[in-house]
Amino acid sequence: MRLGILGGTFNPIHNAHLRIAEEARDLYELDRVVFIPAATPPHKPLVGELSFASRLEMVRLAVADNSGFMVSDMEGVRGGRSYSIDTLRELKAEHPDDELFFIVGADSFNDISTWKEYAAIFGLCNVISVQRPGSTITSLAEVLPVAIAGEFCYDPAANRLNHCSGHAVYALDGVLLDISSSHIRLLVQGGRSIRYLIPDAVEQYIKEQRLYVDAR
């Protein structure tokens, strides 16, 4: 099975997250995409102190109508800081025969050298970097950490960066939905509409639970 992996705080999950997952699923012929909410993100504080359980429930509501999507609570169960390398190793142990595709945003990929054991990620899975409009796979190569750049070679026929492990880095371009969780939180705090930015079921959950009313 070809398994996509999309992590994040999902605070809250929104339509751009879903569209990115769907485009990756379609373009790279993924059988499933698993959404993995972070319990304790290591690189930034969790705004609003929203519980893991609430964020997990919003993701479950968001993906309920898509049979190609699934949700995992593994980072909440594991506890501690939610390092990607630990999650990927756990997934690989659970799915030893599956091909993993780790979906990350361009900003995160640009900072990947700051991640825990970042070099080991490429030996565990393929990486799909969601690029800003107009970016290319060659520009992606330019931000590879110097320490591991020699492990990759550009494959023009497949338009990807091949890693010596047999995995590859792909550039997913053209996802044009400019939606952010921080903007949604501000809209809720200001009493404004968030319709069409998030799934209806998630909007209803936010209203019922009075989430983000005092968000900063």
UniProtKB/Swiss-Prot annotation:
Pfam families: CTP_transf_like
UniProt xrefs under CDD domains: NMNAT (cd02165)
EC number of the protein: 2.7.7.18
Biochemical pathway: Cofactor biosynthesis; NAD(+) biosynthesis; deamido-NAD(+) from nicotinate D-ribonucleotide: step 1/1
UniProt superkingdom: Bacteria
Entry annotated with the keyword Cytoplasm: no
Transmembrane segments: none
Catalytic activity from the UniProt record: nicotinate beta-D-ribonucleotide + ATP + H(+) = deamido-NAD(+) + diphosphate
Stored SUPFAM superfamilies: Nucleotidylyl transferase (SSF52374)
Keyword Cell cycle tagged: no
Molecular function via GO: ATP binding; nicotinate-nucleotide adenylyltransferase activity
GO biological process: NAD biosynthetic process
Keywords for this protein: ATP-binding, NAD, Nucleotide-binding, Nucleotidyltransferase, Pyridine nucleotide biosynthesis, Transferase
Family statement drawn from the similarity comment of this UniProt entry: Belongs to the NadD family.
Record's function text: Catalyzes the reversible adenylation of nicotinate mononucleotide (NaMN) to nicotinic acid adenine dinucleotide (NaAD).
PANTHER family documented for this protein: NICOTINATE-NUCLEOTIDE ADENYLYLTRANSFERASE-RELATED (PTHR39321), PHOSPHOPANTETHEINE ADENYLYLTRANSFERASE (PTHR39321:SF3)
Protein name per Swiss-Prot or TrEMBL: Probable nicotinate-nucleotide adenylyltransferase
Taxonomic source organism: Geobacter sp. (strain M21)
